[in-house]
Amino acid sequence: MESEQLFHRGYYRNSYNSITSASSDEELLDGAGVIMDFQTSEDDNLLDGDTAVGTHYTMTNGGSINSSTHLLDLLDEPIPGVGTYDDFHTIDWVREKCKDRERHRRINSKKKESAWEMTKSLYDAWSGWLVVTLTGLASGALAGLIDIAADWMTDLKEGICLSALWYNHEQCCWGSNETTFEERDKCPQWKTWAELIIGQAEGPGSYIMNYIMYIFWALSFAFLAVSLVKVFAPYACGSGIPEIKTILSGFIIRGYLGKWTLMIKTITLVLAVASGLSLGKEGPLVHVACCCGNIFSYLFPKYSTNEAKKREVLSAASAAGVSVAFGAPIGGVLFSLEEVSYYFPLKTLWRSFFAALVAAFVLRSINPFGNSRLVLFYVEYHTPWYLFELFPFILLGVFGGLWGAFFIRANIAWCRRRKSTKFGKYPVLEVIIVAAITAVIAFPNPYTRLNTSELIKELFTDCGPLESSSLCDYRNDMNASKIVDDIPDRPAGIGVYSAIWQLCLALIFKIIMTVFTFGIKVPSGLFIPSMAIGAIAGRIVGIAVEQLAYYHHDWFIFKEWCEVGADCITPGLYAMVGAAACLGGVTRMTVSLVVIVFELTGGLEYIVPLMAAVMTSKWVGDAFGREGIYEAHIRLNGYPFLDAKEEFTHTTLAADVMRPRRNDPPLAVLTQDNMTVDDIENMINETSYNGFPVIMSKESQRLVGFALRRDLTIAIESARKKQEGIVGSSRVCFAQHTPSLPAESPRPLKLRSILDMSPFTVTDHTPMEIVVDIFRKLGLRQCLVTHNGRLLGIITKKDILRHMAQTANQDPASIMFN
């Protein structure tokens, strides 16, 4: 997603009538300004929708929350719009949770009044399960549709089925009687483009025509994908996981999970995968599932009017996305917990589990691959692993960690260059160039020409008696009449050595192209390319170990396990371990990754090799930098995301970080009873801050509360329309009792109802490690700094991110949202 597009979505900040506060996120969270009021306030429940009325809560720094004055006592009627959020703002977690508790209390208090109220109470209680059920159903159905369409369009680059145009290559030959076992992919019904256009099935002319058509279809699919993204849904590009992590932490990006994004992402994901680019559909499927969760949450007031509750649905949706991407429901739940979710209560765990279950069930019912499995590359191994194999498994872990560190640095450097040069202004041209280079280089090599998922399937598959792949071209010394379950290790034939050279070239090609492909303006996942790179490396290592064991079975490391004629090495297992190691090196996932790969293979006995490889890859990757690829892209885009994995060990104080600094202008504040409507409107027009502390007087600087810019604007506009006598010279009163005014004075405007009476505060001597902990665990966006009750300044989430960058010797300006 281009940060410029996010920037331009902001409103013009000098317009008083624009309710939003600033045109850039830098100003949204800047200095003395505040993004949004994070604390509980009297407008907590002004909006349980647009019109619901709530309760005022008071909160101390100890964190206790108690019910106080009801808003009905303060407002003649609720003000529509108060308490909602603008684009690119961060939600108020505490206020949203208080709104939900008050809504729950209100429903419980009424449910015994009538059967209708009891029905509403039951509907509210079950709405969480209903929304995750709908999300799971939609995610599974869309994933099946994407899988089927992507397979068909991928085969369209090579030819077409004349008997049924909607069949892919494999389905076309299922019903053919002319298909032989050795050439099972050839049948009269399937015609290559060379056969259709020039009437030749073999020869140089046929090869060149197929080459040209392959490039033509690849470029057509890529161009159509990037054009649809650019014109209809700019947010549909990329994997979406960095933005989803940011959204789940409380940031608001309007439209990122909308219906247009869902529709365009679903269509362009098929096109991008079919174009042959070095990308996968698994990451974007998480984005697709979250779009479904967001859309269905609007059907239920419990979630549509509460941003914190909506994020519980999105956490469950991300679990459903991984469930259908890998056929791993439990792995999906753990992925949501480990990788993307910011707030994950126990209830969300259960609902995530249920959403993943429903999504997997729907996908299994659709059976998109015709193998009764949820993924194309499901495999089963029947031989155990041996202790000496831990050494090559750990080596694969080292390779995965080195690949992950290299990829993150190279890809971030390229994306940063794209942002800072003219090349980034031509996203369509970039996609066309990358697609053209990919297609031209990929076609001659059969392993790069394959769909990446099919490549992984071939690399994972163990060599059995029915395999015809060149990877299984071993010299067979078996007695042909002997029926065997496990084929013993055999010397490699010419086909195996030829395949190894082709795999080495494919490995180099995949490494280079994935760096330049991830981040272009089409839907692009990273899971499958990373797994393919690891699977290629793993298969090569597996064949090498297998041949070593065959020719040197008398070595002491092999003697105890590998007897002559025994099947002791499974190269496909090494491919699986390598795939997990490389994906772990890039994403730094651990537990969820092992469970996902274990669910792919269905083999409990291979968990230890997977754990060894994944932990090794994480340790090696962490030695070069603790960030995974998603955190690196979050930092590149400057999203206000406080990573819970980072430790803050410096000894600075709140006074060192707060704004205003020594040479800054003074803090923009409101006084509780001696400012007019014109004064407040002028302050709103002249500043870009999102909120203003309210003090007793300029002399005392005693803190009274905090008022949001948006709420002030809405309240004043509403008062001018609905209350007689409110003019520019009307006194604005935030105090409980209106001060005595001269008889000729215009009617005062009481705004105590929108004032947060308990803004979260820290003293100037609070250590910053405690402040950072408070921001992370409570999800704060800002807190006020006081000294003996007198207001000194403010600390926002951006101030903390800026400070953490400074302590890490980074340029603070480089991490800000631009």
Curated annotation (Swiss-Prot):
Return any one Pfam family short name. Answer: CBS
GO cellular component, alphabetical, reads: axon terminus; cell surface; cytoplasmic vesicle; early endosome; early endosome membrane; endosome membrane; external side of plasma membrane; GABA-ergic synapse
Which keywords appear in this protein's UniProt record, sorted alphabetically? Antiport, ATP-binding, CBS domain, Cell membrane, Cell projection, Chloride, Disease variant, Endosome, Epilepsy, Glycoprotein, Golgi apparatus, Intellectual disability, Ion transport, Lysosome, Membrane, Nucleotide-binding, Repeat, Transmembrane, Transmembrane helix, Transport
Which Gene Ontology BP annotations are present? adult locomotory behavior; chloride transmembrane transport; endosomal lumen acidification; negative regulation of cell volume; phagocytosis, engulfment; photoreceptor cell maintenance; positive regulation of reactive oxygen species biosynthetic process; regulation of pH
**Which GO molecular function annotation, any one, does this entry have?**
ATP binding
Per the entry, intramembrane positions are 241-248, 313-325, 329-337, 572-586, 590-601, 602-605
> What clinical condition is it connected to?
Neurodevelopmental disorder with hypotonia and brain abnormalities: An autosomal dominant disorder characterized by onset in infancy or early childhood, global developmental delay, hypotonia, impaired intellectual development, and poor or absent speech. Additional variable manifestations may be present, including feeding difficulties, seizures, behavioral abnormalities, and non-specific dysmorphic facial features. Brain imaging shows variable abnormalities, including corpus callosum and cerebellar defects, and decreased white matter volume. Neurodevelopmental disorder with seizures and brain abnormalities: An autosomal recessive neurologic disorder characterized by global developmental delay and onset of seizures in the first months of life, and structural brain defects on brain imaging. Additional features may include pigmentary retinopathy with poor visual fixation and spasticity.
The protein's name is H(+)/Cl(-) exchange transporter 3
Q: Which gene encodes it?
A: CLCN3
